[in-house]
């Protein structure tokens, strides 16, 4: 299994913010599918391009083909509460986000987390984040 390391403000390796479509294809291969400006790779890695054709947003969903790490822990296999506790040492999330609970946006870090359901301990749902993303400066403004 591949391991993609998140470098805040820079990359979800090997894809870097600011890369061109050709550069992305050279490091990760041809996309599985393309929807508008969003290119999908490896059953879970999504790359969005801006109007100049440069990467502005990289999102990694949970996948059987790769794991995504940040600050030494696996984002999709670590309890969301623990992820938030650790990331809040680096910055704070937007408490006014209308989807708070489902999503956590750390604007100063250009980092976001998302899950499709709120935590339900009895059902065991919503305990982990389904996706993590980084973006170019100003994307979350």
Predicted segments, located by residue:
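Short helix/turn-capping signatures at newly exposed starts of structured segments
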Residues: 1-141
């Amino acid at each position: 299994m591949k391991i993609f390391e998140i470098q805040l403000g820079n990359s979800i390796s090997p894809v870097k913010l600011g890369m061109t479509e050709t550069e992305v294809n050279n490091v990760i291969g041809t996309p599985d599918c393309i929807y508008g400006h969003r290119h999908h790779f490896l059953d879970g890695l999504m790359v969005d391009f801006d109007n100049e054709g440069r990467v502005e947003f990289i999102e990694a969903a949970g996948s059987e083909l790769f794991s995504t790490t940040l600050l030494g822990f696996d984002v999709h296999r670590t309890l969301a509460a623990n992820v938030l506790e650790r990331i809040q040492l680096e910055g704070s999330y937007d408490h006014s986000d209308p989807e708070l609970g489902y999503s956590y946006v750390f604007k100063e870090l250009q980092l976001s987390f998302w899950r499709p359901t709120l935590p339900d301990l009895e059902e065991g749902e919503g305990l982990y984040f389904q996706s993590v993303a980084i973006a170019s400066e100003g994307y979350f403004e």
